[in-house]
């Protein structure tokens, strides 16, 4: 199975990114430097990591590029790479920037060569030029078909679309070829992203284009990790600007699935807009702010320890006690938040689900436990410093 960035890993990167950008969509070199340097890599290595991750060469890192940089660093630290790789692995290339990577490889002579497949003599009259780009109108139609045929797990089987196949001018062999192309694991069902790609291939074949025989490496990795990012801000080819005509191939393409959707009563399907259900909640933002506060407290403690080390035998500094009080106050505050949530005193947004409240409770519990553990560790360290100071005094 191809490597991938797990959802938990992406969430960790998001917490770091959002805490540094303060609401901005980009991370500057100055903002990223402290995070990257904490890895312990040499400056020349970090420079090469930055060059790899900054795919669009704008001098900043957006969130996708920041994820790339962090994953490359962790792979080096974990021994996956002996040094910074000269090029990004295909599975790590952000789908929205794949065309930039391909263009750069072409200019530098490192273009990836895909297998060339000769024209199929059994398919005379078909056209070349299949395009993986989905126009917004096509994508909306694909999503409508998906919504009507998905199972309770959000997946679609090959047989669920039998009625659609009958309405298309596509041979059964080509339909199965398209299914196998987007289902490399040969599973009985495919998820939403793979289903959209499957319908897109059938759409092109319905218009008279050949079924693609191979998939670009970066896109193939996206199929394998069941996550595809379809960007609709790409410049469309000139043929999309022509007026639809039922007698032209473009007109036939526009009619893909219309008859099928009409039978389902979904001919006037409209998208409802972007789904922001996965947006960051207040508790998640609070977790980000808390982590930032803990980092600041750690820095204060490190400063106190350094002062104590320099002063060995001198007057005991009062800062450790102050830091301890700050940690205790922060811990008490989080415990109070937890009690309020459990008693139903917090003001949540209307319509919140029980699972969302349970997730918030679990997050606060984890924060509280982490703070308690951190406080105990700091107290032990503080006691050790005090013993060292007392030993120094006694030794004089």
Swiss-Prot record:
- Where composition is biased (Basic and acidic residues), the residues are 380-396
State if Cytoplasm is listed as a keyword: yes
Q: Region (Disordered) spans which residues?
A: 341-396
**A GO cellular component entry from the record:** plasma membrane
Q: Enumerate the UniProt keywords alphabetically.
A: Actin-binding, Calcium, Cell membrane, Coiled coil, Cytoplasm, Cytoskeleton, Endocytosis, Endosome, Membrane, Metal-binding, Repeat
Q: Which residues form a coiled coil?
A: 282-395
Boundaries of every EF-hand domain copy: 41-76
Kindly list the places in or outside the cell where this protein is found, as annotated in its UniProt entry: Cell membrane; Endosome membrane; Cytoplasm, Cytoskeleton, Actin patch
Q: Which domain of life is it from?
A: Eukaryota
Q: Which SUPFAM superfamilies match?
A: EF-hand
Positions binding Ca(2+) in this chain are: 54, 56, 58, 60, 65
Assembly and interactions? Component of the PAN1 actin cytoskeleton-regulatory complex.
Family to which the UniProt record says this protein belongs: Belongs to the END3 family.
> What is known about what this protein does?
Component of the PAN1 actin cytoskeleton-regulatory complex required for the internalization of endosomes during actin-coupled endocytosis. The complex links the site of endocytosis to the cell membrane-associated actin cytoskeleton. Mediates uptake of external molecules and vacuolar degradation of plasma membrane proteins. Plays a role in the proper organization of the cell membrane-associated actin cytoskeleton and promotes its destabilization.
- Annotated protein name in UniProt: Actin cytoskeleton-regulatory complex protein END3
Q: What species was this sequence derived from?
A: Pyricularia oryzae (strain 70-15 / ATCC MYA-4617 / FGSC 8958) (Rice blast fungus)
Q: Which gene encodes it?
A: END3
